[in-house]
Amino acid sequence: MPLIIVSGYPSSGKTTRSNELKKALEDRIHQNIDNTKDYRVIIINDESLNIEKETYRESKNEKAARGLLYSAVQRELSKSTFVICDALNYIKGFRYQLYCESKSMYTTHCVIHVAVPQDLCRKFNSNKEQPYPDDVLEQLMFRYEEPNGMTRWDSPLFTVLHDDASCPIDDIWSVLIHNKNVKPNQATMVKPPAEVNYLYELDKTTQDVIMLILDNSNDTSLITVPGSKLQIALPSVTVSLPLLQRLRRQFIQINRQQSYNTNVLKEMFVEFLNGQFETLD
């Protein structure tokens, strides 16, 4: 059932909003609204997985923590479970990876951005019993990649300000249960290319990236994609051609009904691969 990705600065109040949302969803389930009486709501976060805040000081430990979080989400996603992923989720590539997981499970998803000024996060953090170390807090806020509702993996996007009374539960329920998406503005709609051209670009772009990996995997663990700032971070284990082709087919299956230009496709595929490779380390 639905995946709710909560994102925001550290100490921005994400867990408070997640608990608030959990209660609101459970109230509706208790009332059997939309025949949901057999549903349940679960929150997955650093606390439930015993991930210490010091983990975010070293990139290797942080990658392992993201892998743990991703695996927990995978286990809990089911046809009768609301999964609230209450974590930093500050890397767009990881949010895209979670989006792909929800797509593969044929379920809905949304992103909730808990938008709180940095100064207020610092204040909240200083008042915590177990705060983030100051340097870790600053690093995480600096690296934060804010959700963008114009991208498919960050949409539908709900932004909750620090002084908002509550999350927009009615809208969230409609998106997750009734699958009602906000109608895009005509000025911002992407006109889809002819289907045959799009599928050709999807096939060619992904194949080009695979060939780039095969041509360079023996020389470096960080491959720069020509003509862009994109980098492919290879895992410590050997990446075989069958694995790459399987991931390529999975990506194509997820995106064949969409419409993106070549540059966006390349970025999405690189983000997808980086997310998958992280789970292999």
UniProtKB/Swiss-Prot annotation:
Pfam families: KTI12. The keyword Transcription applies. One of its GO terms (molecular function) is ATP binding. It is found in: Cytoplasm; Nucleus. ATP binds at residues 8-15. The keyword Methyltransferase does not apply. GO terms for biological process: tRNA wobble uridine modification. Keywords: ATP-binding, Cytoplasm, Nucleotide-binding, Nucleus, Transcription, Transcription regulation. It comes from the Eukaryota. One of its GO terms (cellular component) is nucleus. Interacts with the elongator complex. Elongator complex-associated factor that is not a structural subunit but rather transiently contacts the complex. Required for an early step in synthesis of 5-methoxycarbonylmethyl (mcm5) and 5-carbamoylmethyl (ncm5) groups present on uridines at the wobble position in tRNA. Belongs to the KTI12 family. This is Protein kti12. The gene is kti12.
